[in-house]
Amino acid sequence: MTVRVIIAGGGTGGHLFPGVAIAEELLRRDRENRVLFVGTKRGIEKKVLKDLGFRLKLLNVEGIKGRGVMRSSLALLKLPGSLMQSMKIIRDFRPDVVIGVGGYASGPAVMAAHLMGIKTAIAEQNSIPGLTNRILGRFVDRVFLSFSDGGKWFSAKKAAVSGNPIRAAFFNGKPVLEKTGDQFSLLVFGGSQGAHAINSAFQDALPFLQLLKGCLRIVHQTGERDCESMAAAYSAQGFSARVVPFIRDMAAAYEAADLLICRAGATSIAEITAIGKAAILIPFPYAIGDHQTENAKVLLKAGAAVMIPEKDLTGKKLADEIQNFYSHPSLLKDMEAKAASLGNIYAASDIVDSCMAMIRL
C-alpha cells in the first residue's frame, strides 16, 4: 500500500529533523510512497530539504506568541491566507495523512487537513507543548509524544508516547577523534548557533581542569561568534581541542564522546537517550514555557543526566562536574544505561506504523 504524506512544520532543526526521520522511514519502506514538506521561507527547511532531495511548499505565516502586539497582530492577519494556501496544497497533493511536527507552518496545514476531512497527527518534541500543538491536539486524530509528561495536555485516547524520531544516519557515525589509553572525550555544544553562556563558562573552567589537561580530548561547537576567542583560550591554557563554529556530522561527534555538555532542546535529549550518553545539561532559560528545563528534569529524575541551571553556571561548578565524571567511570556507565532506557530508536518506525493503521481505518 503506497501512501501520500504531508509533513508540515520546521523553522528550526528541532522541528524539522524529526519530520525528516519520518519521511525517510516512509521511503525506506516503499520508494513509491510520496512525501511533501510544507514550511516557511524563513526557516532552515528550504536549504536542508533541497540538499536531501525532498519537495517543499512554502506558506506565508509567522509566529504569534512572544512577538509583541504589533507583530502578533500582523501574524494573526496572515492566518486566513495561510489556511487557504494550505487547502490548495492539500487539494493538489491529495495526501492520505498530514503530520505536524511543530513550527509556524504546522498550524494552518494541519488545521486545513482537518477541515477537509483528511487524517491528521502531530508530533510534540517537548515535555511542555507549545500553544499551536495544544490547540491542534483538540482536532487531530493522533498525538505522538516524546515525553510521557506531555500526555496531560492531550486526550488519552489520542496520545501515545513514541519518542522523538531520529534519522537513521545518526546511528552510523564514525568517531571524529580516535581515543587512546585513558583519554576522556568531551563534546561541548549549544545547538546549531552555539551558546555564549556555555562557551564562557567552559573558558572559565579551563584553569580548574589543568590536572586533566593531558587526558581530555575536546570537541567544541561554539557558533560563529565565539569560535576564535574559544580557540585562543584553549591554546593559552595548553589544551588540545577541536574548536569549530558548526559540526555537520553530529553522529560522529556523539560517537567519540564520553560526556556531553549541552542545552536541553528536544532534539539533543532525543539523541542523548537514543544512543545512551551521559550529559551535563544547561537548559536555555528563555525558551517558551521554560520547556528546556522541563526536558532536562525528565532525565534528571531518572538519574540519566546532571543539570546546571544557567543562573548557577560557573567555570568552577562545570569543572567540578567534569572531574567527578572522570574520576568515577561507574557513574558514567550507569548514567549511559539510564539515558538509553529512556530512548526509543524505533520512534520514526512506530509513528509510521500508527499513521499507516490510521489511514486504513
From Swiss-Prot:
Pfam families per the UniProt record, alphabetical: Glyco_tran_28_C, Glyco_transf_28
Keywords assigned: Cell cycle, Cell division, Cell inner membrane, Cell membrane, Cell shape, Cell wall biogenesis/degradation, Glycosyltransferase, Membrane, Peptidoglycan synthesis, Transferase
Catalytic reaction annotation: di-trans,octa-cis-undecaprenyl diphospho-N-acetyl-alpha-D-muramoyl-L-alanyl-D-glutamyl-meso-2,6-diaminopimeloyl-D-alanyl-D-alanine + UDP-N-acetyl-alpha-D-glucosamine = di-trans,octa-cis-undecaprenyl diphospho-[N-acetyl-alpha-D-glucosaminyl-(1->4)]-N-acetyl-alpha-D-muramoyl-L-alanyl-D-glutamyl-meso-2,6-diaminopimeloyl-D-alanyl-D-alanine + UDP + H(+)
Compartment annotation: Cell inner membrane
GO molecular function, one term: undecaprenyldiphospho-muramoylpentapeptide beta-N-acetylglucosaminyltransferase activity
Membrane association type: Peripheral membrane protein
One GO cellular component term noted in the UniProt record for this chain: plasma membrane
Positions annotated to bind UDP-N-acetyl-alpha-D-glucosamine: 12-14, 126, 167, 192, 247, 292
Known role: Cell wall formation. Catalyzes the transfer of a GlcNAc subunit on undecaprenyl-pyrophosphoryl-MurNAc-pentapeptide (lipid intermediate I) to form undecaprenyl-pyrophosphoryl-MurNAc-(pentapeptide)GlcNAc (lipid intermediate II).
Protein family (similarity comment): Belongs to the glycosyltransferase 28 family. MurG subfamily.
Name listed for the protein in its UniProt record: UDP-N-acetylglucosamine--N-acetylmuramyl-(pentapeptide) pyrophosphoryl-undecaprenol N-acetylglucosamine transferase
The organism of origin for this protein: Syntrophus aciditrophicus (strain SB)
